């Protein structure tokens, strides 16, 4: 499989992971018991965020710079809406230390309604994010394979840190220096 094909597959998987995240929040807002720890709170630790910051940003220097900037902003916006939901449903109802031991209180009807309002805003941002992802995918499909090889380090070409360290170590008897002075 080529670098380009692998990247497109990962792009689609990242989009799917984002949709799963939104659906988990939908369950939470609907009042259904959900393991809150399964919903990432940190944008850079979500599966989508990991893909965005670790892989997609390699193309931030090419013609996709503006689209990636929009995707990044929309991703942050989605998490801002989720933080509002989290604060409304989770942190307010955790009950402090004893609440963690005894279980959390159920959110009130007004808290659920407020969370649903925040969820509607989240869905709007998420839809815009998915649309920008489709634009980015179209740009990637139109990008030549050579550009992928240039910008994305293929897994089989990944640098082995041990081998790299061995290659950068001086060979033979080379005088070591510290602050310009020879070291014995």
Question: What role is predicted for each listed range?
Answer:
Residues 1-184:
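N-terminal membrane-sensor/transducer module of prokaryotic signaling receptors
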